[in-house]
Structure formats: structure tokens, C-alpha cells
Amino acid sequence: MPEHDVRLQQLTVWLDEQLNDLFRDNAWGEVPAGSLTAASSDASFRRYFRWQGAGHSFVIMDAPPPQENCRPFVAIDHLLASADVHVPLIHAQDLERGFLLLGDLGTQTYLDIINADNADGLFADAIDALLKFQRLPMDAPLPSYDDALLRREVELFPEWYVGRELGLTFTDAQKATWQRVSQLLIDSALAQPKVLVHRDYMPRNLMQSTPNPGVLDFQDAVYGPVTYDITCLFKDAFVSWPQARVEGWLGDYWQQAQAAGIPVHAEFEAFHRASDLMGVQRHLKVIGIFARICHRDGKPRYLGDVPRFFAYINEVIGRRPELAELGELIAELQAGARA
């Protein structure tokens, strides 16, 4: 029997025990007959199931060790809840085996419902939640978005996209260009004020809920650049917006962040430039990750969104002359791949 079927059997036995305890402790009566269905999976090894019965609904996370570790999720869930951010309530946990029984934040993500008409309201709620956790004191034992992490991320682009997807190797001149550009992006990120960073604060990880939004997938949180999450929110892997609207939303966030005491840049143009460069660093990383998911993990579907990230990068290059040589490098690589 495949290993994942064995895990599902183990999870089902564990879930039955936890539901019995949960219903007893809350005086809900006997556990009703329920259904366990696949809720979602993602680009990692984690997968999610939804249990529903007699008006009750829970989500179960299956995060198999050693590939996954539930402990950061649990710790950061409590941290965000302390800031009144709407995150799943953890009803039961088995950290050794990688099982969590969670409250259900609903079935509709922002990505499912967002459109040009409702985006202003949905993003206003997302900004409110972001400001809540950016106000938290930086005293939790979280990693720092330091030089090593930023560099490790950006190097995914030459390793996996250039090397594996395009099948190319940098020339000496291209390598020198890459080193200059990546250093510029890293220096800009490190120069920014620091806050708690979710790292994937995007519509796919925000649920339409009450209160809105429900926030998910925060287990990789770090302390890092103040522009990271807000840039991620508006320059998503799966949906794009006109630049004028993005700048308007960035301006709204910047003004509210200043009023809330978040350490953003004093001038909007400096904030906007930092956001632009932060976005390019993230986009290069994600292009590399999507190539890795394809070639290492056998999940090619994510490569279909790579052109969106190149469009984001090219848009920034058009207004940031300091990144002109990145545009030339990308053009050379794409021409080389076609040759």
C-alpha cells in the first residue's frame, strides 16, 4: 500500500480519537457520522482534509515528517492570534506525527472571489490584518530575513530556472551581472525597517470569513523587510492588477502604516522603490521555486505562471534604471533558450 494511504489510515484513527475528546469536552454530545474529504494540497508535502458532520466542520492538516514540521505553524498561530488576527483555532495536535485538528475558516479564498469590483474592500481588510501583526513586538524566537536567507532564495533562479528549466549556464559576463543585481536587491531588502513577515501574504492564503480575512500558511514567518508582505499581496502568483491600482493600494497601506506607527519609509517614493526591488527579489525566487517544483517534485503546473512574474519584473525594470542590466540578462537568457 502506498505510504500516503498508510498515513491517511493513521490520520483517520487519530482524528476519531480527537473528535471524541473534543465533543465530550465541549458537551456537544456524541460525535455524529461525518465525511472526510480532501480540502486542498499545496506546493509542499502538506495536504489538508475537511471533516463535516451535523453542522460541525474542521480542517485536518497532514504534514508528514521529516519533510514538514508542524511546530512553526503552531507557534505562529498563537502569535498571530495574540494580535487579534483571524487564524485557525488549534483543537488538537500530534507534532511528532504531523497531524493538526484545526477550526475551519471556510471554503472560499480571496483568489476564488476577488475581482475588479470587490478588490478595494477585500484588500482593505487584508491591510487591516497585516497592520495588526506588523505592530507585534519582535520578541518571538523567529528567524531573521538575513543576507544568507535572501541570497539562498535568489540563487534558486540561476540554479533551477536557468540551469534546469532553460538548460543554460551563465557566461562569466552574465555571472558578474547577476552578482551585481542580486547584491543590489539584497542590500535594498536589508536596509529596510523590519517587522513580522508572513512571507506568503497573498490572495490564495486569505480566506473570506468573519472576521475577514482568515489568514493561513504562515508557518514560514520571519522578521524582515517591511515592504515584503504588502508587495506580495498585490503582485500575486495567480492574479495581476493594473499598476495604477497597485500604486493606489500601496499608498493606502503606506499612509495607514505611518498612522499605526509601523516603521515604513518617511517618503512614499522611497517606500515604493523598496517595494519594487523587494518584489523583484521575490519574483526571481518564485520563478526558481516553480522550476524546482517541476523538475524535482514532478509538479509542472506551476510553470504556467512564470510569465506573470517576468511581467512583474519587466514592469519594475521600466521605471528603475538601476535594474536595466537585469532586463538585458533576462533577454539574453530567453534568447539563448530559444536558440
UniProtKB/Swiss-Prot annotation:
Q: Could you say which EC number(s) this protein's record lists?
A: 2.7.1.221
Which UniProt key words apply to this protein? Antibiotic resistance, ATP-binding, Carbohydrate metabolism, Cell shape, Cell wall biogenesis/degradation, Kinase, Nucleotide-binding, Peptidoglycan synthesis, Transferase
Record field: catalytic activity:
N-acetyl-D-muramate + ATP = N-acetyl-alpha-D-muramate 1-phosphate + ADP + H(+); N-acetyl-D-glucosamine + ATP = N-acetyl-alpha-D-glucosamine 1-phosphate + ADP + H(+)
Question: Secretion signal: which residues?
Answer: none
InterPro entries per the UniProt record, alphabetical: Aminoglycoside_PTrfase, Kinase-like_dom_sf
Class of the enzyme per the UniProt entry, highest EC level: transferase
KO phenotype (gene knockout): Cells lacking this gene accumulate GlcNAc and MurNAc. Deletion of this gene increases fosfomycin sensitivity.
Which GO BP annotation is one of this protein's?
Answer: response to antibiotic
Decide whether keyword Transferase is in the record.
yes
| One GO MF term | carbohydrate kinase activity
Q: Tell me the route in metabolism or biology where this protein functions.
A: Cell wall biogenesis; peptidoglycan recycling
The yes or no answer to whether the keyword Cell wall biogenesis/degradation is present is yes
| Record PANTHER family | N-ACETYLMURAMATE_N-ACETYLGLUCOSAMINE KINASE (PTHR33540:SF1), TRNA THREONYLCARBAMOYLADENOSINE BIOSYNTHESIS PROTEIN TSAE (PTHR33540)
Which family does this protein fall into?
Belongs to the kinase AmgK family.
What this chain does, per the record? Sugar kinase that catalyzes the ATP-dependent phosphorylation of N-acetylmuramate (MurNAc) and N-acetylglucosamine (GlcNAc) at its C1 hydroxyl group, leading to MurNAc alpha-1P and GlcNAc alpha-1P, respectively. Is involved in peptidoglycan recycling as part of a cell wall recycling pathway that bypasses de novo biosynthesis of the peptidoglycan precursor UDP-MurNAc. Plays a role in intrinsic resistance to fosfomycin, which targets the de novo synthesis of UDP-MurNAc.
Q: What is this protein called?
A: N-acetylmuramate/N-acetylglucosamine kinase
